[in-house]
Amino acid sequence: MNAIPYVVEQTKLGERSYDIYSRLLKDRIIIIGSEINDQVASSVVAQLLFLEAEDAEKDIFLYINSPGGSTXAGFAILDXMNLIXPEVQTLCMGLAASFGALLLLAGAKGKRFALPNSEIMIHQPLGGVKGQATEIEITAKRILKLKHDINKIIADRTGQPIEKIAHDTERDYFMTAEEAKEYGIVDGVVEKK
């Protein structure tokens, strides 16, 4: 059973009940706590746009605990983060792997954080294909382009040379929160709020 908790808030007009995610959204907090797919991307992008419309000056907080997922869905979130006027602060709580790590490092410079026991993992994109040789070749070219584009984003956002990124992403490259800070993926490790 996947129950979403509700909270009750006292107001001048009485009590008001919210699901926990709606209540957090009032505080400009968005949570990605699952694999990144089209449904998650649509929800996160809608929340980003809503919060921008509410106040284009205030930061938005994106909390990430995700094994990654679809690159197309991940890029939808990343592009929306870059599009909107408010800065997006990112925080890894648990795991930010694959595209989850890209979203973590895509936060505003100086505002990317991880909790002490977080784990961050970068790697090259995964893909599979079957079909005719031409279709396989087209897909292989697309995956190689994605690999280059992702490595460039990581290099640009971390300050690491692209050659190091290309080497490190050949396989799953896991980091602790402190190692991710040294690498340039996050700007700090948060012990207390």
From Swiss-Prot:
Cellular component terms per the entry's GO annotation: cytoplasm; endopeptidase Clp complex
Localization (cell): Cytoplasm
Active site (UniProt): 98 (nucleophile), 123
One GO process term, biological-process aspect: protein quality control for misfolded or incompletely synthesized proteins
Catalytic reactions on record: Hydrolysis of proteins to small peptides in the presence of ATP and magnesium. alpha-casein is the usual test substrate. In the absence of ATP, only oligopeptides shorter than five residues are hydrolyzed (such as succinyl-Leu-Tyr-|-NHMec, and Leu-Tyr-Leu-|-Tyr-Trp, in which cleavage of the -Tyr-|-Leu- and -Tyr-|-Trp bonds also occurs)
Keywords: Cytoplasm, Hydrolase, Protease, Serine protease
Gene3D superfamilies noted in UniProt: 2-enoyl-CoA Hydratase, Chain A, domain 1
EC class name: hydrolase
Subunit annotation: Fourteen ClpP subunits assemble into 2 heptameric rings which stack back to back to give a disk-like structure with a central cavity, resembling the structure of eukaryotic proteasomes.
NCBIfam families recorded: clpP, PRK00277.1, PRK12553.1
Function: Cleaves peptides in various proteins in a process that requires ATP hydrolysis. Has a chymotrypsin-like activity. Plays a major role in the degradation of misfolded proteins.
Family: Belongs to the peptidase S14 family.
Protein name: ATP-dependent Clp protease proteolytic subunit 1
